[in-house]
Amino acid sequence: MTKLSVNINKIALIRNSRKGNNPSLEFFSKKIIESGAHGITVHPRPDLRHIRPDDLSDISLITKELDVEFNIEGNPYEERLGDYPGFLNLIDAVKPSQCTLVPDDSNQLTSDHGWNIHSEHNKLKDVLTYLKQNNIRSSVFIDPDISQLDAAKDVGVDRIEIYTGPFAEAFEKNDENTLATYKEAIEYANEINIEVNAGHDLNLENLATLLSYGDIKEV
């Protein structure tokens, strides 16, 4: 069964725009889980535009109490900046169920491309080793590229998360070539025994098509 992990960044963005703690991340995390989600996802960024470091312990506690997964996304190379302690320091403090590594820069609006694992192999390997030593499942954000899947297998990642922004656009335009690229990538990942997550712009209209391409563990 494909599991659903809900990203609560936008709830945090609204909260921060209003100041105070309304809407409450804790309240809505519980509501999301009670509604059937299998996990909560956050992506803390150095500019603290939405998720803040002090949110993480409360969300972690809720996910443990309600027996669902906690997935923290981010760039492992982001270092301490003001009140942001650095990404790996956050991971070390919280030790989530899953850590999804994304290649965003600090000023990026949203995740919009995957890693070049070939060029980042050695640095990513060090991070993946740390995650494994701490019993944190690793996931690496990639584009639907067979070469990157081979590199992901070689570097030792537990899962890959396929960036599905272009898939969603191709679905709207009925772009069969792009859709076929995603199908091929998911089938190949299944063949080489890399577990697959997928994320970005998925909705009730396009999700069934994506899930028909193969075994996807989480969206």
Walk through the language-model features, giving the residues of each.
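Conserved N-terminal beta1-alpha1 strand-loop-helix module at the mouth
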Residues: 1-69, 76-78, 82-85, 92-94, ...
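Histidine/lysine/aspartate-rich catalytic loop segments that bind and position anionic ligands
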Residues: 137-192
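Alpha-helix-loop-beta-strand connector modules within alpha/beta enzyme cores
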Residues: 49-74, 117-139, 175-200, 204
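Active-site beta-loop-alpha junctions enriched in small/polar residues
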Residues: 7-13, 45-47, 73-79, 102-106, ...
